[in-house]
């Protein structure tokens, strides 16, 4: 299926592609969508530019790469692409690794993903929204922040659990201060959208300060002093 005139892929497009893969496969593989791909499959976003899929099992990952190469997918530097879909990059993550983050548990574990669809050979899930927010905010671009606000706005994310899991994951990061700063930015966005209340907003500040991170969520803009521009 050629979609080269489009620059974003919808959930329907992706399911069609995976169904085509499934027809040609002679092995089973578990795929867990993450990032914008998961948000698209869960109908939180309309479409995504890149296709991000976790393949938790190494043997399945190796088989899938071999299979895709046989279908003339080729590495582009950022992932795999096909001549029929040159604008779409398929990024496959092996094990518990997503973007710059190692998940604390396998995404295949119960409650760590949401079932999207099963075919004869492919099991497709979407990373649970708590872990999805963690992986996106560890990277922490503006687009990641907006996606995470949209995910939180579904009402399917427990704020207390998110704070606890994010803090635990930060302990294992090479730059914990940076990822905590990213969480502060997210908290400010959630508070602005009235998705968390003042009490929880302050709890985030207290929690981060207990970590030694002094810059908790801001209490609002400070008045400009003479000479400020």
Report the location of each language-model feature.
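Compositionally biased terminal segments of proteins
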Residues: 1-229
């Amino acid at each position: 299926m050629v979609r080269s005139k489009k620059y974003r892929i919808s959930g329907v497009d992706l399911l069609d592609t995976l169904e085509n893969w499934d027809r040609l496969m002679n092995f089973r593989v578990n795929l867990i969508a993450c990032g914008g791909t998961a948000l698209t499959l869960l109908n939180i976003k309309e479409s995504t530019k890149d296709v991000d899929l976790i393949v938790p099992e190494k043997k399945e990952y190796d088989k899938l790469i071999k299979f895709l190469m046989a279908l003339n997918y080729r590495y582009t530097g950022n992932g795999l692409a096909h001549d029929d879909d040159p604008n779409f990059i398929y990024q496959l993550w092996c094990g518990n690794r997503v973007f710059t983050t190692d998940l604390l548990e396998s995404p295949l574990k119960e409650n760590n993903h949401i079932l999207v669809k099963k075919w004869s050979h492919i099991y497709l899930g979407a990373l649970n929204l708590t872990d999805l927010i963690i992986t996106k905010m560890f990277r922490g671009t503006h687009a990641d922040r907006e996606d995470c606000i949209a995910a939180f706005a579904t009402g399917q994310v427990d704020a207390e659990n998110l704070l606890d899991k994010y803090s635990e994951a930060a302990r294992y990061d090479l730059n914990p201060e940076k990822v905590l700063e990213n969480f502060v930015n997210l908290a400010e966005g959630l508070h602005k959208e009235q998705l968390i209340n003042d009490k929880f907003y302050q709890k985030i500040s207290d929690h981060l300060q207990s970590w030694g991170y002094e810059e908790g969520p801001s209490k609002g803009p400070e008045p400009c002093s003479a000479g400020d521009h």
